[in-house]
Amino acid sequence: MLAEVQGDPPNPDPLRRRCCGCARKPSSRKAQKKGTFWGIEVAETLQWRGWELGKEVIKHLVLKNVHEKTQKLSYRCPSTRFFITVFPQPIALSPGMSLTLPVIFRPTEKRDYEDSICFQKAEGEFSVTLRAVLPHPCLSFPAAVQLPLCAVHSATETTFTVRNVGDLTTVFAWETPSPFSMTPEHGVLSVGAECTVKVLFQPKAAAVCNVIATCWFGVEEKQKRTMQLRAQAKYPYLQVNVPGEQHKGAQPGKLQDVLCFGSVPVGTSVEKCVEILNMSAVDAPCMIERAKDPLLQDHVFSCDVSHAVVPAKGKLALCIRFQPQAVGEHSTDYFTVTPTGCLQQTVLKMVGSCKGPLVSLHQSSVDFDWINLGESSTQMLKISNVSDVPAYYQFDIDGRGSVFSLDRPCGVLEGTTTLVLKVTFRPAHPISYHRRVVCLVHHQEPLYVDFFGTCHSDTAKPAILQARHLSWYRTNTVRGLTFYPPDILSVMLKDGKLLMDEKRALMLLPEIPLDKPPKEYTEASSMSEYFYDGISSDLALFPPHVSVSPREHDFGRCVPLCKAEPLPLCVTNHTKGKITVAWTPSYGSAFQVTPESCDIPPLKSSAFRVLFQPTQLNSLYAAELEGFAFYKVLRQYSNIEEDATICPPWCLTIRLRAHTYEAKREHFIPQYLLDVPKTFPPVASDTDTYCSALLSNTGTSMITFSVNQAACPSVLVKPHSGHIMPGGHQIFFLSTRPVNTVSQQHILPLQLNSYPGYTKEIVLRSCAESLLLLLEGDGKLYFKPVCIGTSSTQRYTIKNCTRLPMAFTWKIHLSDSKLLSVRPAAGLLQPYEAMAQAWTFTPDNVTKYLLRAVVFVGWESPAPVSPQSIHYNLRIIGEGALGTIRAQKEHMDLGNVLVGNLKDCSMVLLNDGICSLQYILSVEQLITGLCDPEEVCSDPMALELEHSRGTIPARSKAFVRVTVRPARQLHYTWSISYAICTPAVPDLASTKAEQHPLCCIEATGVHPTIRIAAACSAGSASGISRLLLWRLLSLDTLNEYLQRDPAPSELTYRVPTRHSTCLIPPIYTPLQLDFNFGAAPIGSEPALVMLLLVNNGVVPVEWAFLFPSDQKMDMEHWAEDANLSPRELHQMRIQDNQLFSVSPKSGKLLPGQEEAVQLSHRHDFVGTDHLPVLLKASYGHEILLNFRGVTVEKEQRYVHFASSKHLLTPIAIGTSHPPVQIYELYNGGSTTVMFEVQLDSITRVQKDNYQHPVFICLTPRGEIAPGTTGHIEWIFSPLEARTYLVDVPIHILGGDSALITFQGEGYDPKATGESATFREVLSPSVLLGSTKLTVPGQAASLSHHRICFGNIPDRTRASRLVFLNNISEDKAVVFTWRTGSVKDNEVLQIAPEQGVVQPRGSTPCFITLQPSGRVSLYSADLVCEVYIQESLVQYERDLQEWEREKERQAVEFTITEQDLRETAHLCEPSAVVRKYKTLPPVKNHPAANQPAGHLQRRLLSSKEASHVWVKPEPPRPILLHLDVTARSHSTEDFFSNFTSEFPKYFLPRPSIHQVLFVDGSVDRNRMEKDPEWLSLATASKEELQIVTDLLIGVIRDLLENTQFHDAVRRSLQEPIPYFSQFQREETAKTQHRGQCSTIPSSLSASPDLFTEENGERKETSQESSPSNDVLGSWEGLSEVLRHEQLREQKMMMKRQPAFGSLVEMVLENTLQNILVEASCGEVVLTAQPKVIALPPRPFRSLARLRSQCQGCLCRREVAADCSLLTPKAISSLSE
């Protein structure tokens, strides 16, 4: 047994190391522990033991150099005076050399001493401990002992060693707490001795034991030391399992505890094994014993093992032996497997039956017909054994003395064989012969066969005996007519005293009552016929017609041979006719009967003699004599008048024995085998029981046997005596009739060979069985409280305690039959079988019940309920109650569940009642969301219950596992109800009316979704704007599709799988998108595209970009297809050269998580590259992305068209100012390209639409710089609500042309009732951008990548704030904004346009949009060029050095060279730096350091480069794209479509001339009608610039000319201006107010009219002089009028356009300053406002009227007396 023993804790290190780095190596010597320190090997401790006072003890410390170099060291002496060594001196040790240092110990007192010697080396110090200790006891043993797991009530043990490591002999004693014990508990250990101690763990309960054992040791002074004992005890759990075939009725998958042997041949034994399984983690000792049962039972089941140990988690094979003894007996027995402690019992049931031979005769009679005297006849008799058990058979006939003989009268009939026997008929007299011969079979009832035949002679010819005569004879015997001879029967038949039935058998006249039928012959059992012969027993089936006495006789010892006395034999005729007895002569036999034949009158007897004539001494003699008695009238057939009166003869037999052994001569020793059972088969009281015995003669001599029937009269044996030939056998049948149930022993003496010394006592036991049924629980059955209307089933066991099969029947009172039922109600219990019955109790009221049931039991043969049966009462106690079920959580939300995936939860059902409840659960499903109700109503149930029905015990809970699997991306609601399962509600279909709501479960089916949140480009695609990039990659369509539900074909492979066998995998996705990387010249930098993937769903998503090679399965080379298509070759070239790459190619995103993915296209080969890449989201979408990239030759003119079809924004019909729309062209080449739009098709469309210009191209020609995007402006003006198409050729000068289809849609706003098109400036997916996406090497980022101004009125200003953030930690950046076109410069303003951003800093940039007066759809790409400031500074230095070198070389070339002009011209800078004019120093940049595909711009050859420096190139900027979108509307359109938004914008008030010029209708009409306007719109930049400069000069001159201003002013002051009729109404009113306001200006010219002093003076004068009241009131009125005039003037000023523009600018600058300060943290916009309490106002008179000046910010109070105001004054005030 294994145990874990933990050693002593390590002692403190005796060596005190003074520095780190020393490596100590333990020595292999046990006597002295050594260590190695920097190559010096030395003992760690020197210890002195057994020292005495006054003596010096010397020990030597050895130092050895184990290093390969010479070691030098020194040491210091011990610090105390008790340890002395030699004076310190330097030590040098060569490799392998040793030094011995003596240490002297001088003690002065008895105590412990400790010191050390310190050694110094260059590497550090180490010390050796010197210790001297007193003699003391010390024991060494482990600190802790772990014992193995142990079963409760079992024991486990382990051992450990206790060693005396002290200096004294010591005693020890253990104190161990329970359940541990030590052996030995105490002892004595001498110095250095050790002993083994055993720890025994005997737990009584399951627990983890962790105790402390104490060891006391020492002689004078007791010391103790503790040990920790750890062990764990567990309860064993044993189960029995029968391997192999399952028992009938057993549930599959469960352990079988019934061992079925089946049918086993009698006398044989069969072994089968069962497994005892130990389900626990501990070894389980157990006992195997037989269940307690009566002692009378024969133990046909046996097991040799009574105690065993089953290993933990293992099994034990147990062999059970079955050896049945009685044929047809069904055996049942039980073994119990009980673990130690009787904690649990496991019962093993064993069943088996005994089978024997099944022998039958093919015919019941053998008819020899008739033969002549002296002849013989042979017939065949077949005997078969249909069983597989061998059968011993014997025909009870002696062929030597009978007219009938068999060739094999006895033998063994093997299983399933048939034997053909020859029966020979040799008659000795001319008479009829009939003998009924019994065939005895061991372990089977006897068989009977009739031998009959007729012998004729010349003188005697009796009637021929036939089979019908035997049948008539048996019927006549029953009717009592066979005692009359045939002649008398014939007379009675003639006289009518006898009749014949339908079978022609004789019968007497019918008796009263007439309906009583005549008696018929019925076959008796073979055993009854065999034993009830009137000879072996006193009973007989029928009275004998002829009897002979004696039937058996033993002549005894007949010596000398001539003195054998004859045996008198008496034959009696019991019939009423004269009979003749003829004996069959036995030729060669020592026994003869005289006379051979004799007639016997009716009812008379006749005497015969049996003579015994032996021929030799010391021999055994035995024989059977045969004779036939018949009616004398049957000797001649002519005497028979009626065939039905023929009566067969009766056979008489006599068994004779004798021997001629002399008196002192020992008889022959018999050699035999006796097979006899130990007990009689069980029967009921006063019933016959039978068994057979087999006596086999295994010797070479005949054996005679005799059973002393008188010695045991209670047992009948047949035959009583006889003989057995050598090799033969004799079958006995024994019978007894037990009366009581007390076991009775029977002893039968069997004497062999007529010698008392050869007597074998056969001991048999018999016992009558009485009905005994064992009821479980003393006949009481308790039911737990049961819910009304429901049923409770309880198991109740009854056991047959007898050895006979017992039938039972339960009777329940009729009134209780509705409440109580049992299954099965009747049945058969095999011997000692226990049956568990199912009792069902169904209460119907809330009450307690006391019911009674009766079981009637009886034997199997009669009816169970009969006078012979008995009954037992069973009391049933139960209670009816009410109960309900509730859910612990009435509402459960499972949240989001992946569509097609499983999610489960536990639904807890609570039963708070006192009764168990059987329930049935039902589920109703409700699907809500954006779906078709008719389509989803047919969906299968997406919720599955682990079990829909079950039982909850009282006051307990049940867990139901709920699994949901949504099939759609919708919201699911399941309402779960329950119904109590009752006989009225047996299943779910019957529960509709009994439903009770239980709980509600919700879940939402979701698909894993991702979307592209942002995209940016770099490398050769850095010039592509974000909006164009978004369209090139079809990201709108991709995002839109990613939000849909995946198609079933997309879920063919739910996760990325290698499923294709070809290079081009099959396509299962319904969507294919183009991922266009644009175009670039060959050798350019790779086009980089950064995509930001966002998991916008609620479940994690795994995504992957799968190239065709990622979808192909790995196959052997021979399986590959060698014939590749051009498409496959193209894809292989792309993948092999890695022209397209994705990094990372896969990942996993949690909800809300983002990840950047880099896509690249390398421009290594000229042409168009295509590669299908599958974007796969596990359990979601898979979309085929066609990667496409174009590589062109250098200097090739190439314009990349995003698509061949362009959709213009839909325009409402009747729109007076249709917006300008743009079509983008991207120049993917390296040179500037010119394009021209062919307008012929546009003219045709205009002609088809009544000369209405549906399509107007504003930029029919233009140029596009390399790597930039050009715009073609269009105006779409529909005439009807329909779709317009036009195919427009676009020619690229020096390049390819393209035919682009422009499609526009006109709609009727009145019909649609909405203006949605106005509101859809950009799609929502485009608006949502992320600023977290950066390209490699990006040093700055924008706070927004896209700005949408939305819909704005024309000529208004709108501003947005964007922050430029420097994400670098230590480098400042320089930025410069640039726009894409002249038009963008006109409408967009950026402040600041350039600047420097410090590390980790940010700069606010204000983007202001002011439409230029033409309604347009604005889509501008603002590019922020960002440089690292250090790189610019370095570039400036390099450029300055290069310029100085250039000047120096120019001088040198002027003197020495003739081509200086060309060189100078060649080295001129080709670019102009806008801000920084200096260049960095000249450096020779090797090609290896340049990026891949970089276009080298060296201007000198390699030869010239050695003399002239190459001009340094400016650093490449980082391009940050800012997309600005907006749509401008005319004021009228904006007001009509966006009324609520109109007040948010400031509309500048232009002059009359401006209004007339900018009027949209006039301007648009002029554009449409004047052809020259179109040519002006298509003018070049230079032409437009000239016109602009001229107009600016003219306008500036007019604004500066004062004479012009005066002339305009004078014209406005004319009485009736000529053009006043054209002015607006509001202008006229304003001018009228202005004229009116000038009237009282002279009156208001007094400067002191409204001073405070004058006001106070007038007030005091009013109080002092009443005569001045009227004058004061008029003065107050004039003051009010003057204030009104001032207010009117200020209002006029506010209405001026200049004033509004000024206020707008002030407000705009104020808000911008606030935002800038807030971004710097100076202002907190979200802080709570502070409230300052103002002081209270002083009290003023209520008579004072408060009025406020309109148009100013002051508040004045004017005193007024209402009584002094006249009506005229009031009217003036009101005016």
UniProtKB/Swiss-Prot annotation:
MSP domain residues: 1331-1460
Cellular component terms per the entry's GO annotation: acrosomal membrane; acrosomal vesicle; cytoplasm; plasma membrane; sperm flagellum; sperm midpiece
Residues that span the membrane, as ranges: 84-104
Phenotypic consequence of gene deletion: Loss of the expression of CFAP65 in testis which is associated with an inversion breakpoint into intron 3 of the gene may be responsible for the infertility associated with the Rose-comb trait.
Tissue specificity statement from the Swiss-Prot or TrEMBL entry: Expressed in testis.
Places the protein is found: Cell projection, Cilium, Flagellum membrane; Cytoplasm; Cytoplasmic vesicle, Secretory vesicle, Acrosome membrane
Key word Zinc present: no
Compositional bias segments (type: Polar residues): 1633-1645
Keyword set, alphabetical order: Cell membrane, Cell projection, Cilium, Cilium biogenesis/degradation, Cytoplasm, Cytoplasmic vesicle, Flagellum, Membrane, Transmembrane, Transmembrane helix
Disordered: annotated segments: 1627-1672
Record flagged with keyword RNA-binding: no
Similarity annotation: Belongs to the CFAP65 family.
Job of this protein: Plays a role in flagellar formation and sperm motility.
Listed name of the protein: Cilia- and flagella-associated protein 65
Organism per entry: Gallus gallus (Chicken)
